[in-house]
Amino acid sequence: MMKMRWLSAAVMLTLYTSSSWAFSIDDVAKQAQSLAGKGYEAPKSNLPSVFRDMKYADYQQIQFNHDKAYWNNLKTPFKLEFYHQGMYFDTPVKINEVTATAVKRIKYSPDYFTFGDVQHDKDTVKDLGFAGFKVLYPINSKDKNDEIVSMLGASYFRVIGAGQVYGLSARGLAIDTALPSGEEFPRFKEFWIERPKPTDKRLTIYALLDSPRATGAYKFVVMPGRDTVVDVQSKIYLRDKVGKLGVAPLTSMFLFGPNQPSPANNYRPELHDSNGLSIHAGNGEWIWRPLNNPKHLAVSSFSMENPRGFGLLQRGRDFSRFEDLDDRYDLRPSAWVTPKGEWGKGSVELVEIPTNDETNDNIVAYWTPDQLPEPGKEMNFKYTITFSRDEDKLHAPDNAWVQQTRRSTGDVKQSNLIRQPDGTIAFVVDFTGAEMKKLPEDTPVTAQTSIGDNGEIVESTVRYNPVTKGWRLVMRVKVKDAKKITEMRAALVNADQTLSETWSYQLPANE
């Protein structure tokens, strides 16, 4: 038996060191497909209680020793650092290095870390394994390596470009989000990272995803820059039927903003990682859905065929909109998903979850296909995710976009010039754009508006905004039943020419 094992290892080594050998997503897909045909094995924690039961402040004390960054002794611009297990990051992930001739496991060692005041026995953690990893790159200065990618927890990953700070997250896959049965969170259980050459400007990462009802193989090509772009290829296999599959999911946070002001006095006018869902539908329509922090779970679906793009955006970059020196929400990126090929019929879905503070991610957006194959059959999805602070460049230049949405008590100016509340809710929506700024200010811009059965549009007016060189829509709305949601839409036109994206707003219930 020992001889056979040695022979098998020798054969594998020969394959890995063959000059014709090259690692690819197909190698990961074979494992994913094999896993899909077997019963799910839940990951087992090997974490000592001192790490499992620690508080966040203690976990923060465990820091990677920067002098021991992986590839530190190579000329490659990319470096790797690793996350230690602790708290709810209590199961190890395997991390491998891929070279031109071989795959090599990157082994855990406590010597990679400094532990602060955390008391531990080195012998009990010597084979612990990592919780995840981060990628460093000289994105802001050629003399300094900054973190640009973090892969930690379930299938979450965060990415930033030049001058950005971490905000929203992307995920590999979402299953049954917002369904009564409860959400299932797939996890990346193993990674393979290609060793980059000194001249490489991109980093390739492969990942094996596992979950009770799905497996998957992923290839991520990270291209850092002013906008960091991640090219994603995924091969997904169902173990069992799911209620809903979320492809290219994005996760963010919205606590309050001018469309839904803070119920308590707060020096910060806005507090969010993203303030809207942008969609470029298959028929060419652009849609903007401002985000809410509802009192009850809210799910919005936008049905279409072959989406051209969608993303959770942070529109409005002035520091004065946030006034937060610690968390710098003005520097947090937007994330824009651009599908490759035809994704067929389905929906872009937005999930908004009530939250009382900014520590909870309460916003999710993803693509969900109408039809799913039988378990075991392969699904392929290719797309890019662009992490950017230049939201106007994510939009068509000839189509105006919503710069801000503000909610106010509706009022009417009396003959004595005093404004008197009239029982309505007023929405102030500013539209701007490169082509719109070229229009003469006397252009007869009007609004096409509509509202659902639970509301009535009392008045809508459009006027030129000389500050933004765009147009401002003011719409006064009367809600029939405040216990129900109210849907409304608006777009700017000039005669039969559509000038703007569609503002699609949902006023939450009980507001």
UniProtKB/Swiss-Prot annotation:
Subcellular location: Periplasm
UniProtKB keywords: Periplasm, Signal
Database matches in Pfam families: MdoG (PF04349)
A single GO BP: beta-glucan biosynthetic process
Molecular function terms, GO-annotated: carbohydrate binding; catalytic activity
Pathway(s) it belongs to: Glycan metabolism; osmoregulated periplasmic glucan (OPG) biosynthesis
Main location: periplasm
Taxonomy, superkingdom: Bacteria
Signal peptide: 1-22
CC annotations in GO: outer membrane-bounded periplasmic space
Protein family (similarity comment): Belongs to the OpgD/OpgG family.
Protein's job: Involved in the biosynthesis of osmoregulated periplasmic glucans (OPGs).
PANTHER family cross-referenced by the UniProt entry: GLUCANS BIOSYNTHESIS PROTEIN, GLUCANS BIOSYNTHESIS PROTEIN G
The protein's name in its UniProt record: Glucans biosynthesis protein G
